[in-house]
Amino acid sequence: MILSKKNNAVIILILLILSEVILAGTTGKISGKVTDAATGEPLPSVNIVVVGTTMGTSTDVNGNYVLLNIPAGKYTLKFSMIGYADFIVEDVRVNIDLTTKVNAYLKEEVIQGEDVVVVAERPIVRKDVSNSQMNLAGESISSLPVQNVVEVLKLQAGIESGRDGIIVRGGSANQTVFMVDGLSQNDERSNIPYATVSLSAIKEVQIQTGGFNAEYGNLRSGLINVITKEGNSSVYSGTINFHYSPPAAKHFGNSVYDPYSYFNRPYLDPDVMWTGTNNGAWDSYTQRQYPQFEGWNAVSEATLKDDDPTNDLTPSAAKRIYEWQHRRQGEITKPDFIIDVGFGGPVPFVSEYLGNLRFYTSYYQQRDMFVFPLSRDSYSETQFRTKLNADISKSLKLVVSGLYGEINSVSPYNWNVPTGSVLKTTYDVANLLNSSSGNAILYMPGYFSPSSIYRTMFAVKLTHILSPKAFYDIKLEHFTNRYSTYQMELRDTTKKYQPVPGYFTDEAPYGYWGYSVSGIDGMIMGGWMNLGRDQSVNSTTSLKFDIINQLNLSNQLKAGAEFVYNDYNINAGTYSPSMNTWTREQVYQLFPYRLSAYVQDKLEFEGFIMNLGLRAEYSDPNTEWFQLSDFDKLYSAGYGNSLEKSAAKEKVKGKLYLSPRLGVSHPITDNSKLYFNYGHFLSEPASSYRFRIQRESNGLVTYIGNPYLKLERTVAYELGYSQNLYDQFLLNIAAYYKDVLDQPGWVYYQNLNSTVQYYKATNNNYADIRGFEITLSKVWGKWVRGFINYTYDVRTSGYFGLTKYFEDPVEQRDYLRLNPYQSKPHPQPYARANLQLFTPDNFGPAISGMYPLANITLNILADWKAGAYTTFNPHNIPGVVDNVQWVDWYNIDLRFSKDFDFEDFNLQLYVDVTNVLNTKFLSQAGFSDIYDYNDYLESLNFSWEEGVEHGNDKIGDYRPDGVPYDPLEPNPNNDPEIAKRNEERKKNKSYIDMPNIKSMTFLNPRKITLGIKLDF
C-alpha cells in the first residue's frame, strides 16, 4: 500500500526507533536441550562451546540453550559439566537464517577423560523453513559439472537462465537480488545482478524463490545469498582449479568464413561468380539460398565505363579485391579457460596482535571465445575478492571486504544508445548475422563497439554481541560500476597495400572510419560502424544496522533499517561524424535515495513456526522534473536541447510503502510439514525508466523518463508440502501465484504534424504468474546422490490503457481498432535431473597404499523444456495466434572425476562434457532475414494443414545433412506413385527448406573441458 505524506514521517520514526537496518542474513543459530542420559532430567549450567571458535553459551534452568550469530558452515559442539563425560557432536551444519537443533545427553563420568562422540543427524525436513529454498554447501557445488554460480542456480526448480541473468518463477533478472556475505551485488543502473563469485571461495549458497522475510527489500522474485569462506586463524589453506577447453568451433557445419558459406559463395563459386547468380548454373532453389550478385564480369564492365581511369579492373582483379576486403578469418584458435584460485589464513606477522586477523582471497579469470570475432574475439572476465576477519574482543567482530571485477566484451547495440549490456553467449553473437549487414559484421571488426565494465566494492561490517541472546551489526558498503564503450583505433588510410598490380588501397575494413565507405561488393566499410559510446559511472552507498534479540526459547525478534544512496552519472550515446541522424545522447546525473525499515518476528513451537514481518520502504527520486503537456513543442527538434533551461519544473515527492510478510510452517510429523507464505514485494524501476532523457543531435527528444513512477509491485502466495521418504529422500511440492502490478513500459506520443515523437515511461504493465514445482532429492549417501525437479507455470502479461497517443484524432481512432495487448498463456514446463555416483574412500584393491577405484565420481545432468508457441499466419486470418510450436529442448552434460588424497593436499582430475549426445537444435540465428524464416515455415507440414501438406512438424524440425532438398509434389488426384514418393520425402524430411546461414543454424556442439583441482 502507498501511504499519504501526512503519515510518512511518523511511521518512519516509529520503525527507526524499533529498528535500524536491513541486513541480509549471513548466519544461523543452534538451539537445543541438554538432559541426563540416564534420568532424562534437564541439566542447567552446562557449558557449550563451538570448538575452534570463541563462541559458546550455557544452558538455562530448564536445560535449554541458544547459540546466535553462527556463520553458515560445519561445526563441532562440545558439552561439558562437572561429574559428566564430555559430549561432543561433530558435523553440525548451520544454514543461513535457519535454526539447527542439537540435543545432548550427558552420562555420568565413569572413567576420567572419557568423551562421548556422536555425529549430528541432519534433518531431512527443515521444520522452520516456511518458503521454497535450497541451501547448497560449497563441497556439493564443486562436484557438479558447472563452471559458475549461475549454472548452479538454474538447476533448481523455478529458475531459468535469461539474457540478463536468472529468471525466477517467471520474473525478469532485475527482480532478483544477488548477495555475497550479505552485500548486494546488483548494479542499480538496471538492477541486474552481478552474479560472479569464485567457486573456490564459496562456503554456502542459499537460494530462495519466494516468501522472503521482511528484512529483504528491492526484490520481487528471487534471493541468492552466497557466503564465502573465512580464513583460519592458525593455518593456511587454499584451492587452485583450472578448466581448459581446446580450441573448437561453437557451431555445427562449415565455417561461416568458408568460400561456400552464405556470405561468400555468390562471389567465389565458379558456377556463378563471373556471370552472376541469376545467369549461372544455379537452380531457382539455390538462388533463393544466397544473396544476389551480378557477377565479376558486370563489376569489371562498370569500372571500365565510368569516368575514373584509376579504378579500371578486370573481372579477376575485382575478385581479388573482394578477397582482400574479406581477408579476415575468424576460426577459433584460442582455448576457453577458467582459472579459479582461493587462498586464506592468518595475516602474516600481525595476526595475533590484531584479534587473530585472518584473510581469504579469491581470484577468478574466465575467457569464452565468440562463435566468430567482432571488435573483440571473446568474452573475458576477471575478479579479485578478499575478506578480512578480526576478533577485536570476545564481543566485537570486524569484517572488511573488497572486490575488483572487470568484464571485457562487445556492446550489442548498433544504432541504439548503450545501457550497460554486453555480449556473452554463443547465441547472442550468432544472432547478429541475420541482418542486411551480416557480411560487414563478419569482416569489419569495428561494426560493434568494444565495451568494458569495471566494478569495485568496499565494505565494513562490525558485529557487537550484547549478550548470549542479542547482537547487532553495522555495515557500510560502497559499490561502483564504470562503463567504457568506446571508439576503436582510427584506420590507417595510407594507400600502401596493393592487392592487384597497380591498384593501391588502405587497410579497410580494419580500423575505425566514421565516413561512408563501401567494398567492391557493397559491404559497409565505414560510417555505419562503432556507433555506441558509454562512459557512465554509477555508484551505490548503503549504510545498514540490524539487531537480533532471542527474547526466549520460542521467540526471536529482528529489526533493522537501511539507507541507500545512488549516484547515477549517465553519459551514453551514439556518434557518427558523417550521419547526424544516428548521433544521439543520453546524459544525466541524479542522486536518488531510499530508506527502508522492518520488524521481523520468528516464533518457534513444536508444531508451529511463524515468520511475521512488516517492511516500510521510502523511495525519493531527489530531483526536480519537467512540467510539460503531452505534445509540448519543447520535445521537438530545435527546442529539445534547451529542455532543462526552458521547461517549468517541480520537486518530485518521495513515496512511502508498507509491505506485510507472513510465513508459516506446520510440522505434521517429524517427517513432514505444510508451509504457506504471503507477502508484498517491491523494487525500484531501472534508472532509464525513471530519469532517461534521450535526444537526437537536432534536439528532438525521443525518450523521456518518469521519476513519478511507482515502485514495481508483486503480491505473492505460496503453499507447499515437504515429506521425508525412508530417511533418504526429500519430496517437496509447492504451488505459487504472483500478481504483478505497476511494471513500467514505454508509451508513444505524436503530435499533429509529427514534429513531436517521443516515448515516456509509465506504470502500465502487469503480469499474472501461477505454477507448481515438484522436487525429489537425495542429498546424502556414500554411493548415490541426486535430484529431479519439474516446474509448470502459466504466464499472462499485458498493458493497462493505451501504448500510443496521437494528437490527430483520425490516427488515434485507427490505433484504437487494435485491442490492448495481452499475451496468451501457453505453459512451457521444464525439468532437470542430476545423478551423482560415487565410490567411497578405500574402495577396491590397494596398490602401494593407493586405491585406484576409490573416490571416483560420475555426475550426470539432464535438462528438458517444452517448446515455445509462436504465430504463423501468412494469410493474415483474424484470430490466428500462437498456432505453431517449437520442438522440445533437452540436453545432457556430465563430469567424470577422480580424487587422490595425499597427506597435505587433495588432487582432483576431471573431464566435463557438455551436450554429451551432440544433439542439434535449430537456432533462429541461421535465418538470413524474415523471408528466409517464412520460407522455412512454409515448407513445414503442420497438424492444421490439409492434403499433402498435413503432418506433425514443429518449428525446429530439420532436414538431415546429406539429404538434398526435394519438395513435396502436389497430389490432387491421389496418385499412388506420387503418394509413395511424398511418403519417402516425409520420412527423410527432404521437403524442409533449411535456413540460409547454415553455419549458424545449429550451435553449441559437444564440448570437452579438462580440469585439475588442488585443495591444500
List each language-model region with its residue ranges.
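C-terminal beta-signal and adjacent terminal beta-strands/loops
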Residues: 249, 253, 786, 851-875, ...
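Gram-negative outer-membrane beta-barrel transporters
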Residues: 736-739, 756-869
